[in-house]
């Protein structure tokens, strides 16, 4: 199982950051709460056949 942090910035750029554990995903997502450049951050659980949204910050 992989985890993805999808970050949507004010300038329209979308970046994906992948992590091997939920703890790493959650740790990095906390920084998004304090950034003024980020519109939304979405935490995803990425499986072989299914992607599940875990949380949204924004």
Predicted features along the sequence, with ranges:
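Short aromatic-glycine-(Arg/Gly/Cys) micro-motifs in beta-strand/loop hairpins
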Residues: 1-14, 42
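Hydrophobic beta-strand residues in large extracellular and virion-surface proteins
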Residues: 5-7, 19, 25, 38-41
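Intrinsic disorder/low-complexity signal
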Residues: 10, 22-25, 44, 55
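A short, exposed loop/beta-hairpin motif centered on an aromatic-Gly-Thr core
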Residues: 12-23, 32
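Short, mixed-charge low-complexity intrinsically disordered segments
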Residues: 32-58
């Amino acid at each position: 199982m992989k985890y993805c942090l999808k970050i949507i910035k004010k300038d329209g750029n979308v970046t994906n950051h992948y992590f091997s554990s939920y703890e790493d995903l959650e740790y990095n997502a906390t920084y998004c709460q304090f950034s003024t450049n980020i519109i939304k951050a979405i935490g995803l659980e990425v499986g072989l056949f299914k992607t599940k949204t875990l949380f949204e910050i924004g």
